[in-house]
């Protein structure tokens, strides 16, 4: 029995079906792909129907279909009064999902606030904000990227 989960078998079946991994029911985690392991991790968090969730890189290794499904489930949770604390390096996704955030580099909080409050203007995105806050210029980062691409050719 899973603490706090009534009707466990039905809930397990629901989340296995929701994540499309019913056929993996009896498979050991070590034998699952990274994406399947991520689905198991998320299902184990979602099964409790929590009002508060802490997630670390929740969309890592998920295909776009399940990224979208999970993103919508999480947004619905927030809309119904839930709270999510999430760590992510995918700033584009964080910008679409979060109403408040902290930008951290090397363990130090560089800035926190609303997504719009962190931007200098409407043209700036969170990737631009991060680059600015860590003391680089966008032009410098793009130049370094171009140099790395030239070396690979």
Task: Report each predicted region and the residues it spans.
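Conserved catalytic motifs of ABC-family nucleotide-binding domains
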Residues: 49
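Conserved ABC ATPase signature
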Residues: 28-32
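Catalytic Walker B motif of ABC-type/P-loop ATPase nucleotide-binding domains
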Residues: 53-56
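ABC ATPase "signature
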Residues: 112-113
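A short, surface-exposed alpha-helical micro-motif characterized by mixed small hydrophobic
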Residues: 94-96
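Conserved ABC ATPase "signature" region
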Residues: 1, 6-24
């Amino acid at each position: 029995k899973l603490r706090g989960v009534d009707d466990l078998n039905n809930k397990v079946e629901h989340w296995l079906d929701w994540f499309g991994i019913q056929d993996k029911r009896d498979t050991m985690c070590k034998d699952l792909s990274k994406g399947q392991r991520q689905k198991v991790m998320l299902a184990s968090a979602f099964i409790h129907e929590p009002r508060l969730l802490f997630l670390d890189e929740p969309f890592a290794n998920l295909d776009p279909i399940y990224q979208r499904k999970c993103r919508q489930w999480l947004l619905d949770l927030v809309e119904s009064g839930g709270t999510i604390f999430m760590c992510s390096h995918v700033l584009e996704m964080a910008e679409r999902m979060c109403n408040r955030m902290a930008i951290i580099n090397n363990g130090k909080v560089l800035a926190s606030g609303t997504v719009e409050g962190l931007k200098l203007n409407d043209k700036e995105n969170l990737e631009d904000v991060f680059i600015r806050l860590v003391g680089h210029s966008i032009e410098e980062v793009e130049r370094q990227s171009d140099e790395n691409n030239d070396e690979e050719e």
